Amino acid sequence: MASREERTEALAKNLHIYVSEAHIFTSDAIVLASFCAPRHKDKCCDLGTGNGIIPLLWHRDFRPKEIVGVELSESAIELLNKTLKENNLEEYIKPVHCDLRALKGILPNEYYDIVSINPPYKKLGTGIVNEGEDYKNARHEFTCTLEWFS
């Protein structure tokens, strides 16, 4: 059962996702999951997965061979684990609690067919910085920038 801060949102008749005030998803995650459109044989990794919306949509819509979601926030990983358990998806989606900057050696190199990332939109020093680690890291480039991956 969801706590006061947590709630579930339906993704299909028999599929729901746990969200919280700090870990919600928007239409851009839905568009990104569809844009990537994995095939059944693909091995997929979503970096900065948050509450796991992209891996869940990949599983719901495409059923790729393997799905991994990497996330820094412990509270987001807890939501993802709760979602996986209550939807009986633990064998299909593997959550990895890790800082992207420390990922080398944790996941194999040149292994995944699809790697997605929906990075923060605000560069350091711009905009109003949200309070709280989860809000701050999800919306500002404190722990991840696009330049790190280029």
Which ranges hold each PLM region?
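Mobile active-site "lid"/loop adjacent to the S-adenosyl-L-methionine
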Residues: 119-149
